[in-house]
Amino acid sequence: MNETDQIKPCPCGSGLGFTFCCGVKGRTALNAEVKIRLSDDGSIAAGTPTPQLQKALDTLESNPDLFPARIRFIDNKAWYVKMSPDWYRESVFLDPERIKGTYVVETSLSWLQVVCDRIPWQPTAFIFHTAFCGSTLMAQALEALFHCLPLREPEALGNIQYYLSNPAVLPEIKQAWFGRVMRLLSRRYHPQQGVVIKANDFSNPLMCDLLRWDPSVPMLFMYTPLNQFVAGCVKAEIRREWIQGRYKTVKAKAPALLKMADMPEPEATSYGEMAAIYWSYNIALLQQAMGFESAQLRSLDFNHMLDHPLAVVQACGELLGLQPLSGVDAQAEIDKLFGTYSKNSNFKYSPEQRAKDIERALTEHKAHIDRAEVIAHQLLGDAYPEQGLPGSLI
């Protein structure tokens, strides 16, 4: 770290120096100490806020500078981190382990309930996906061409999803909190700016919950065809561990959704079967959501975006109700993003690299892919998307 880094203000906007805030080596929102703790009435119970933090607290109802990193209903607590437009842009994902902001504020849910009940719902769009399908790239492209605040995989969605599944909580209480969390996430920096929430793939069940809550919510579901999804799951050890974990999360839920009494039980290394079950489960979730007959719910094969990136990104912006930025060379921005895919400034990945990786994986793991095709056809039956998913964006 150079001398400039040592003395510069932290990009989170906390008012502290970078090396004393988000620049502390090894610090994340998970392991950072709580800087400010509020009482149930909103008064400061612990810590001394900087003027910048006090302003963020005072404007929390309208300004997203304090972002809900985690909401723990069982503990009656919520934790927020100080953010800024730059820090949102640099945060590949917004879960506590990877979000850039590490200045932590803690409150009770009693206080949050009062605050959220005063926050108006502002139209917000969602991107759901299967994983390995360019959803992060789409969020970046929307930010480059439109007035857009992309929220990439906020854990708060998973927190409310888990809460909704709690049978001990009354439905009306769960729905009230669902609305509060959605309104909290819908805050933006200026009225023209549209919020686009790119959900974690865990959160695909929320598609139906959202449509019940507000049938007009715009949604895009991104996916890759099964063979490419399987190739993405098996091409490296970290990916194989990933699909094992994902399979374990849905294996108890998938039979009812897929109407399969006898669900295949993959062996420990049957990654193709695990991928087929997880992919089929998510495709079935989309098809269930399509039953709401919302014109605002569309699907997109990642390959179509790679073939026609500018047209697809513009069509997505229109679907999601975003306003184009003025004075932007859209083609140049798209060429920059798609010429070298970059999740952030430390990650570079070209389309040629992706194509070679997929081609190699399709060849090397043909047995996994062939088995996956058999399993997915069994699980989805006539609903297997031979010609792509319904409601295509283009």
Describe the predicted segments one by one.
Residues 32-292, 296, 303-326:
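PAPS-dependent sulfotransferase catalytic domain
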Residues 25, 29, 146-149, 320-324:
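A generic secondary-structure signal for well-formed alpha-helical elements
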Residues 169-180, 239-254, 346-356:
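A polyampholytic, Gly/Pro-enriched intrinsically disordered region
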